[in-house]
């Protein structure tokens, strides 16, 4: 009879139902667990630790391979080998309550026979690593009207699609009275430890077999994702490279840090890194290439109990948690099977044990290619030196605490010669081959980029004449220097904003607290009654995204002679709305405009006339969907997905503007207890608004989104664009009778996402190349500024001839050599490359000789650039000392 809660005797490990890994794993089973008596495991020699028996302490602590108690008590659980052993459940032995092939916590055994197993059965082992049901493609496909020949009818559209267009207060989604059932969904990815807790409740999920993106479920089903990791740190001596003789005094040392440095005389290298302990939770993700990271010392690694050849067998045991396993109860809400990870889960897939991102990256420098110099290696207490790395680990004791550090004093490698930096490097080849113009400037940034930056600077520094615009206050709260970005509404204006239902105006202003420019969106005549909406404002402040204009603060003011509500956003100079860039042409609606009765209709416009390139539309889709994904992940809704509220900076960079305005203007007092009660409906409305924006872009006209023109608009899209774009529009505009997620359109975007990523990185390469030119230009300007403070100085220290004597005279002749060259005919010789080359040689101090001729041509001085640099530095330091009062 078994005493381990249903575990079989050790002989069961070799049963046919278990994997071939059982024989290799069973040798490290802990004693006293699962009915295996202490010391009965094959291949394990349980001995009493002689160091613990003598001093009642052991250097290795819990990591010691020997017992710290009397061997007679070895049958008690928890003794003998420690937590680095592999549990018997991994050796193919069934666990109580689970049939063979199923592992508690979501593990799976061999793939079952049925093709579509019941997801609720915990023993089917669905979605096992490399096995399980393929699903997805065999189930019924998601029927979307208009796709694959399906007819697009009015009944297939959402009720809110035709309720309003872009123009209107509620034109961004479904009406509030339309109630959608809030269905919590879950995903098959459960790698976030923060979401996996014992108190999580199970949530219902729709059948992934009917999902159009269920292939994603199968593609990611073979991933080995560990659910929890409990990192533990190794002390010095618990590392893999320790080679301490059994008779060494290092084992008896009391100092847990410096004992090996003081008493170990074997000279064996010791790896001075923190090593994450390999626990049974960490073993759920075996690394086939772990041998590359295991030190190749003379000792046997702790992982050697499981041979490298058997590591591949773990792929059948450690599988993705199946939906039918008890681990389903630990999944977090807000996860979707239809499109992989939902926005509530996707940003949290990184385990908390992963390395934290470095906010300050290390700048590459030549020191990374250097080794410690010979002077730095002659230390008093060298611990060890790794021959491969050439780094010396040194020990220093301060106040009884021993510190270990690695000396990284750089010294050039043998045979390595660095340039003296007086010659410009050529353009990077990957940038040179993508240059659109053959005559691109060599020393300055591109004219197009320069002009764009200058325009942004002009707009940022623009101010108004207060006498001409007295209606604009000089200061509003902590903001000053207001500049209207839109034409100010007349004082007697009655027409309200078509978007927010209030009269609005926009200003650029500078904050007195940080002197940074911001964009102020003023809501005229609004009185803030309930401050509970500030909870949503605080949530918006935390959102930082490249495609969202960040909200900084909201305040009320009476500086405009009436109560006003002001939203402060980041200011993006030079931005224009999508409406003004793409929908400002009145002739673009000719395709949808009907002529009067009795008039002959002229020929339809050419198919491609005035239409946007599909690549541009997909670039917009990627950015807008990315913004929606971030907003929905934060538990908020955009509600301003409108061409008038989407900013375009540069060529294709989008930013969603005016976020959070609707959350304050339409805040319901009945939502005091739960301000996020209606966010699920608003998020569904965001997807409909996104579909309308994409359809308007595809038609290049706002008339295409009207109900009477919808069929004609879809025909235009079908003729001129790909089926993927048509299907995406239909998916966003049709009612799917279920809660949708922005992640559902990611499979439709497909590989076009990589196209946009590639274009963005290529653009970054070009801008970095232009920046490199300006870095050199700034250095040369500072050099000229220093040179100008020396040349032709009328008097210094009461010496009127100071600039004409000594080292200053050489610098004066060098100035003539730079700028006052003439041709043989006596004409001025203007050569920018000559000036740049000579300045770079002066800055580098090259040993090249130069002939300096006096103005009367009676004397010639031959000096080197290194001599000129010495004269230049000494003279400038003399000026600095006099300016600081040190002379």
Swiss-Prot record:
UniProt feature, compositional bias: Gly residues: 122-138
Zinc fingers (C3H1-type) by residue: 43-71
Protein's recorded name: PAN2-PAN3 deadenylation complex subunit PAN3
General function of this protein: Regulatory subunit of the poly(A)-nuclease (PAN) deadenylation complex, one of two cytoplasmic mRNA deadenylases involved in general and miRNA-mediated mRNA turnover. PAN specifically shortens poly(A) tails of RNA and the activity is stimulated by poly(A)-binding protein (PABP). PAN deadenylation is followed by rapid degradation of the shortened mRNA tails by the CCR4-NOT complex.
Residue list for modification Phosphoserine: 354, 361
Subcellular location: Cytoplasm, P-body
Keywords, alphabetical: ATP-binding, Coiled coil, Cytoplasm, Metal-binding, mRNA processing, Nucleotide-binding, Nucleus, Phosphoprotein, Zinc, Zinc-finger
Coiled-coil regions listed: 751-789
Residue interval(s) of motif PABPC-interacting motif-2 (PAM-2): 284-299
Domain characteristics, as noted in the entry: The N-terminal zinc finger binds to poly(A) RNA.
Skewed-composition ranges (Polar residues): 298-307, 363-392
PROSITE patterns: PROTEIN_KINASE_DOM, ZF_C3H1
Annotated region described as Pseudokinase domain, given as residue ranges: 463-750
Lineage: Eukaryota, Metazoa, Chordata, Craniata, Vertebrata
Chain spans, region Disordered: 102-147, 284-307, 325-392
Residue numbers binding ATP: 521, 570-577, 644-645
């Amino acid at each position: 009879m078994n005493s381990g809660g249903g575990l079989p005797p050790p002989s069961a490990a070799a049963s046919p139902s278990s994997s071939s890994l059982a024989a290799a794993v069973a040798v490290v089973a802990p004693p006293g667990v699962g009915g295996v008596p202490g010391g009965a495991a094959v291949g394990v020699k349980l001995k009493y630790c002689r160091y613990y028996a003598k001093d009642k302490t052991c250097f290795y602590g819990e990591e010691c391979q020997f017992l710290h108690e009397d061997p007679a008590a070895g049958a008690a659980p928890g003794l003998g080998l420690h937590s680095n052993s592999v549990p018997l459940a991994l050796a193919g032995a069934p666990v109580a309550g689970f049939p063979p092939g199923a592992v508690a916590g979501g593990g799976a055994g061999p793939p079952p026979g049925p093709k579509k197993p019941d997801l609720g059965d915990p023993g089917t082992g669905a979605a096992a690593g490399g096995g399980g049901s393929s699903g997805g493609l065999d189930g019924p496909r998601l029927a979307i009207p208009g796709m694959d020949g399906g007819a697009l009818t009015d009944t297939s559209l959402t009720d809110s699609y035709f309720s309003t267009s872009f123009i209107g207060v509620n034109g961004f989604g479904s009406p509030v009275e339309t109630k959608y059932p809030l269905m919590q969904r879950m995903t098959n990815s459960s790698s976030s430890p923060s979401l996996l807790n014992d108190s999580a409740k199970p949530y219902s999920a729709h059948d992934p077999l009917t999902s159009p993106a269920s292939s994603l479920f199968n593609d990611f089903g073979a991933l080995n994702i560990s659910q929890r990791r409990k990192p533990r740190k190794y002390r010095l001596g618990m590392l893999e490279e320790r080679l301490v003789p059994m008779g060494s005094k290092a084992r008896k040392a009391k100092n847990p840090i410096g004992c090996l440095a003081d008493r170990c005389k074997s000279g064996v290298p010791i790896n001075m890194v923190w090593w994450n302990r390999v626990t049974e939770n960490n073993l759920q993700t075996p690394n086939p290439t772990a041998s590359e990271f295991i030190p190749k010392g003379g000792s046997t690694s702790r992982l050697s109990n499981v041979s490298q050849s058997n590591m591949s067998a773990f792929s059948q045991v450690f599988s993705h948690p199946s939906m039918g396993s008890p681990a389903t109860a630990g999944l977090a809400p807000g996860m979707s099977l239809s499109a992989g990870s939902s926005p509530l889960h996707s940003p949290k897939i990184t385990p908390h044990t992963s390395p934290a991102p470095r906010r300050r990256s290390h700048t590459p420098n030549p020191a990374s290619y250097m080794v410690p110099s010979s002077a730095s290696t002659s230390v008093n207490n060298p611990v060890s030196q790794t021959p491969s790395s050439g780094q010396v680990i040194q020990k220093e004791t301060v106040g009884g605490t021993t510190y270990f550090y690695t000396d990284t004093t750089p010294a050039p490698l043998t045979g390595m010669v660095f340039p003296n930096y007086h010659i410009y490097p050529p353009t990077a080849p990957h940038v040179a081959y993508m240059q659109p113009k053959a005559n691109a400037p060599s020393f300055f940034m591109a004219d197009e980029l320069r002009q764009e930056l200058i325009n942004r600077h002009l707009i940022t520094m623009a101010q108004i004449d207060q006498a001409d615009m007295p209606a604009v206050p000089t200061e509003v709260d902590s903001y000053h220097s207001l500049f209207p970005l839109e034409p100010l509404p007349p004082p007697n204006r009655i027409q309200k904003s078509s978007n927010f239902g209030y009269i609005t105006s926009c200003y650029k202003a500078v904050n007195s607290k940080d002197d940074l420019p911001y964009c102020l969106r003023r809501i005229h005549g609004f009185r803030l009654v309930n401050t509970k909406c500030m909870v949503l404002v605080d949530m918006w402040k935390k959102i930082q995204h490249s495609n969202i204009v960040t909200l900084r603060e909201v305040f009320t003011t009476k500086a405009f002679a009436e109560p006003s509500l002001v939203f402060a956003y980041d200011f993006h100079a030079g931005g224009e709305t999508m409406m003004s860039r793409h929908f400002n042409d009145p002739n673009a609606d000719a395709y949808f405009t009907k002529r009067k009765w009795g008039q002959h209709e002229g020929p339809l416009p050419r198919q491609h006339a005035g239409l946007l390139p599909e690549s541009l539309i997909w670039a917009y889709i990627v950015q807008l969907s990315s913004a929606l994904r971030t907003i929905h992940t934060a538990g908020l809704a955009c509600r301003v997905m409108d061409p008038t509220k989407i900013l375009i900076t540069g060529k294709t960079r989008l930013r969603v503007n005016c976020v959070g305005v609707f959350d304050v203007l339409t805040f319901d007092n009945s939502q005091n207890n739960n301000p996020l009660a209606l966010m699920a409906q608003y998020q569904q409305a965001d997807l409909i608004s996104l579909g309308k924006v994409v359809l308007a872009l595809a038609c290049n006209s706002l008339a295409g989104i009207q109900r009477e023109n919808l069929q004609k608009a879809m025909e235009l899209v079908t003729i001129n664009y790909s089926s993927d774009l048509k299907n995406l529009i239909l998916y966003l505009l049709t009612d799917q009778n279920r809660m949708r997620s922005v992640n559902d359109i990611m499979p439709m975007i497909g590989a076009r996402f990589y196209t946009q990523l590639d274009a963005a990185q290529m653009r970054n390469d070009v801008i970095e190349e232009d920046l490199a030119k300006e870095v050199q230009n700034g250095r040369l300007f500072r050099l000229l500024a220093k040179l100008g403070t020396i040349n032709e100085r009328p008097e210094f220290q009461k010496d009127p001839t100071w600039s004409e004597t000594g080292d200053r005279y050489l610098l004066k002749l060098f100035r003539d050599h730079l700028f006052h060259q003439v041709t043989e005919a006596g004409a001025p010789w203007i050569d920018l490359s000559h000036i740049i080359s000579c300045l770079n040689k002066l800055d580098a101090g090259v040993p090249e000789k130069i002939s300096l001729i006096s103005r009367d041509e009676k004397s010639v001085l031959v000096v080197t650039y290194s001599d000129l640099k010495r004269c230049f530095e000494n003279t400038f330091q003399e000026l600095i000392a006099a300016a600081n009062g040190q002379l």
